[in-house]
Design a protein with these regions (language model features):
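NTP-dependent nucleotidyl-transfer catalytic core
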Residues: 1-158
């Protein structure tokens, strides 16, 4: 069985040919847990669950990583509006999201890291981007300098 996926850069269907047929890696941006899950959260959840199941049928090892963003401006604002801690808010909303996953019969990802578990690494990576000139600070935010990276969108792995 061949697998074809749409390449967003060319907008054409292309055969999926992995670099290593024994190990497939799949990273999916998960929810930002500031409010109860909605249909917009369910759509990518179901689509990538189907892809995960198809890939597992064809390949030996499929590693599926889906993060949970449990700290950001929306979370802080929502926790302040509800007068609860960000931790209490994100735990409640994460539980609701995971309950919805089970209800939709979606398999658990191989790994489900939370943003707060990797803050130190993120700070280190952000500082490296700033040091290399790929990012800059403005008004207490850090922005990626797209113009400084000619292959932006093609391959960010080499930064």
């Amino acid at each position: 069985m061949d697998i074809f996926l749409t390449n967003n850069l060319t907008n054409k269907k292309e055969q999926f040919v992995p670099r290593d047929k024994k190990k497939i890696g799949m990273y999916v941006c998960g929810p930002t847990v500031y409010d109860d899950p909605h249909i917009g959260n369910a759509r990518p959840l179901v689509i990538f669950d189907i892809l995960f199941k198809v890939l597992k049928e064809k390949f030996s090892i499929v590693t599926y990583v889906r993060n949970i963003t449990d700290i950001d401006d929306k979370i802080i604002k929502s926790s302040e509006e509800q007068n609860i801690s960000t931790k209490d808010l994100t735990e409640k909303v994460s539980k609701n999201f995971l309950d919805d996953c089970k209800f939709l019969n979606c398999e658990d990802p191989t790994y489900q890291p939370k943003a707060t578990e990797h803050i130190d690494l993120m700070i280190k990576m952000i500082n490296e981007l700033i040091d290399k000139g790929f990012a800059y600070e403005n008004n207490k935010h850090v922005y990626f300098e797209v113009k400084k990276f000619s292959d932006y969108g093609l391959s960010l792995i080499h930064i």
